[in-house]
Amino acid sequence: AWGFILSAGQALGQAEGYKSLPLNAEFVSPPDSGEPKDRRAESARRQRYSERLRLVNDIYKGSASFEDNQAAFDQWYNEVVFAQMSQDSDAMLEAMATNREAMFKQLGNASNAQAVNHLVANLAFNKFQEIVTDNYPPASRLNAVVILGRLDQTIAKPRNVAPAPLAKALPVLLQYVQDGALPEYVRVGALWGIERHCRIDGQKQNTQIAAQQRSQVIAALLPLLGPKPDDRTQPVDYWMNRMATRSLGA
């Protein structure tokens, strides 16, 4: 489904010369220039990468202090993880889904709530909004809006803790759906996130989505159940209609 939607979005005629977040060359090799690489430098780079990843995992486990290492933690995500997801090289595009799922796996295994909350509510929430709304590669923008829809303020734990989606992400996703200037693949990705918010909320005994916000969801999604606009492709219209229907029925 995402392939159809992304292809339709790229056909909208976005300009070339996409933005990308700067990669930290201390941890990640710069884009391939075609010149032979220095093996010793590459080995040192891989060593630094492994050491920083180990530190981040130790922070999540609580065996390293988040307060003492926040600068290193922030640098890892802003200059490595998020930056990798903003590149348009073939290698980075192929690794994008793997990198995304690795990030969510880290969150699922983490026990340090302070570090998790900082990543979700501050770093990821802010940086992926930037990627969604600016001239980043289409795959990066779609990936970013999907991540925004998956951010949780309470991380699910098997058999005993249900997920609670990040509440402040829902108004942002609604704004994307209603913004006709955004590529339609972004709007479909936002609808997927809205459906997730509504579905999880519908499974709870006590709803977390306020009545006023539910009214905003209805107002944003009902128009999508109407006839297909002339400038919208059939696959995109199908997924918009489907996600809107599932959200309203949750």
What spans do the regions from the language model cover?
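Long alpha-helical repeat scaffolds
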Residues: 249-250
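Extended repeat-based scaffolds of very large eukaryotic assembly and lipid-transport proteins
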Residues: 14-243
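Bacterial N-terminal signal peptides
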Residues: 1-7
